[in-house]
Regions:
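Conserved HGGG/HGGXW glycine-rich cap/lid loop of the alpha/beta-hydrolase fold
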Residues: 49-98
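Active-site nucleophile elbow and catalytic-triad environment of alpha/beta-hydrolase enzymes
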Residues: 199-215, 229
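Flexible "cap/lid" loop of the alpha/beta hydrolase fold
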Residues: 137-145, 152-182
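Alpha/beta-hydrolase fold catalytic core
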Residues: 2-7, 13-60, 85, 277-291
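Catalytic active-site module of serine/aspartate enzymes centered on a nucleophile-bearing elbow/loop
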Residues: 255-291
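Active-site loop/oxyanion-hole signature of alpha/beta-hydrolase fold enzymes
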Residues: 90-130
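Short beta-strand/loop motif that positions the catalytic acidic residue
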Residues: 219, 225-227
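Conserved loop-alpha-helix segment in the C-terminal half of the alpha/beta-hydrolase fold
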Residues: 80, 227-256, 262
Length: 291
């Protein structure tokens, strides 16, 4: 059976039109109704908007941050795996899922402030993060901000800028095409979807982020940069990010795309767990220094 997906280029959600997905099979079905779990779901008033979040498990806090147009359910594969090991905290980012938008111009800076606000709301002393796509961008922004004590973070398919030096050219073109379609819907006063919200999400993809590479040196956390070797984000850009973070490791997943957390969650989760659970190492391959 063909799956309907929404391609906001850096994430997968239901969308403007059906896209046949024959090559990448993703799982978003779980026994627990993640994102709709009334038993654990709560709202917090953060920076003027009601932000919906859920918590699972006990232990050290682990934030899971989803990608553009996604929701809590998007990272159900990670919740399933990590909730037996950590206190998993996951929210619908502003304007997505059950969380309010309350702005006419959404930015990664705003989403970052929201997550920092949620950390303060929950009175968390320190955290670790797994961020996918836009969630990875937010994780990097939180690390640069330095307002939250972050032990470790794993980013999957994150980028510093929206142009073709970082993102594959076909994806840049697709964002432009989708923008035109959304603007047409707004002009037609179509009411089948909230097209103004859709435009804001596409503006995030097309115009942001704009993180100076030099700012990565401010990140004190230990970071694992992950990407698929067939990612939307260019591998050389993932390498660029890795090379400018003081305490970083790099993992290019063979035979995987931007969607590995859902298409190959077993491998992705094992990689992330190994990084989070084991002492950080960045050995020098110069054996003349070995003792």
């Amino acid at each position: 059976m063909k799956k309907r997906i929404k391609l906001l280029v850096l994430f997968v959600v239901f969308s403007i039109g059906p896209v046949a997905n024959a090559q990448v099979h993703m799982n978003f079905k779980f026994e627990t109704p993640y994102g709709e779990n009334k038993a654990v779901g709560k709202y917090a008033e953060i920076n003027g908007a009601k932000i919906y979040y859920e918590e699972y498990g006990k232990g050290e806090p682990l934030l899971l941050i989803h990608g553009n147009g996604g929701s809590i359910n998007s990272m159900g594969n990670q919740i399933d795996y990590f909730k037996s090991k950590y206190r998993v905290i996951i929210a619908d980012s502003r304007g997505q899922g059950k969380s309010e938008m309350k702005t006419d111009s959404l930015t990664y800076e705003q989403i970052t402030k929201d997550w920092e606000g949620l950390v303060n709301h929950l009175k968390l002393d320190s955290i670790s993060i797994i961020g996918w796509s836009d969630g990875g961008i937010v994780a990097l922004e939180m690390g640069i901000s330095g307002k939250t004590k972050i032990k470790k973070m794993v980013t999957m398919g994150a980028n510093l800028r929206p142009d073709s030096t970082a993102v594959n050219g076909w994806a840049v073109k697709e964002v432009g095409k989708s923008k035109k379609e959304v603007l047409s819907k707004i002009k037609q006063k179509d009411t089948t979807r909230n097209w103004k919200v859709e435009k804001q999400m596409l503006d995030l993809l097309g115009n942001q982020p704009n993180i100076p590479t030099k700012d990565l040196s401010k990140i004190k956390a230990k970071v694992l940069i992950v990407a698929g070797d067939e990612d939307i984000i260019k591998n050389k850009h993932s390498l660029e990010i890795y090379e400018h973070i003081p305490k970083a490791q790099l993992c290019i997943m063979p035979g995987e795309t931007h969607f590995a957390p859902a298409s190959n969650p077993v491998l992705f989760n094992e990689i992330a767990n190994k990084f989070l659970a084991e002492p950080f190492k960045r050995p020098d391959s110069n054996w003349t220094k070995w003792k």
